[in-house]
């Protein structure tokens, strides 16, 4: 079997950690007798600064011919915040409709956690984050009402003292296209606003994914990859110790304050939960969950949440599992091209020093193998990661070691080849 993988190393430490990920994946492909054809794309800060190009339609079509995307990191202080994120990372998520962001939160043996008294069996759950809607749809703006008021006064118009601004916002997704016509009137000098959107289908599909994921996770004793139907059940083996019997989905929102959007989310969650009577369910507000992640992480199995809350909570999850260098993410379209990445940023101050932890990227590669149906290969990689962490002989500085990025990649690849 041969797989074509689009590689976008990106910025900062991205190329360094991606290099180690490729090293390990190439090693396991030899062990398991499949081929990986890497198709590298230069898109990131350097490419943007030289060419002004982000991700165009032609490049996206080329990536679409690949089986998956292996992504490093994005972000550079020379480029205004949001340009690369919107033009590359979010473009990939939205173009390929990667509506699930799956993030395992797992403490490995040998890795210290800031949570006193918590053991690996206590920190082992997955967050399923809706990945294409909520406040990340890109609908918003800024309005200087004071300027509009002055213009009206200069013209002697009625209602001088209040500014009026008209704006049109458009949202285009695979599920829908929306257009908002806004007329803003007031005496404030300047305002900014952001619109969050949840659709019924968008909520249904990610919530149903979470329930199917919880069901398959319990059957296999784990959970970390994703597919559809039998393929999903077959390909989920990471993130849970064998023998644990919890089967629970926790819905996280803020429906007590943001009643329209998240009350809608709760309603849909309740409807879908009825289809899975064997799975325990609970509702929780996001502020409470932030506390419980720290106080009682053992109470969680599968957490499903809208986009913004998931973005925030999974960084907290990363810290309780040992840090961002150990936290992978999968952006999944079960029927299309999915993308796999570490959740850490580009960390430009560490770029070129050879000290970035590549384990999150290597683990993301394991998740990619699961998604591709190479479950045994995925398990081999995860086992090698686990052994390196347990032995604590070859670790980067963030985990108390003195090894280089490449040393960690070499050690994991060596264990893969010896499996």
Task: Give the positions of each predicted feature.
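Glycine-rich phosphate/nucleotide-binding loop
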Residues: 47-48, 290-393
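Extreme N-terminal starter segment of soluble prokaryotic enzymes
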Residues: 1-5
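Glycine-rich phosphate/diphosphate-binding loop of Rossmann-like nucleotide-binding domains
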Residues: 6-23, 28-29, 147-150, 155-159, ...
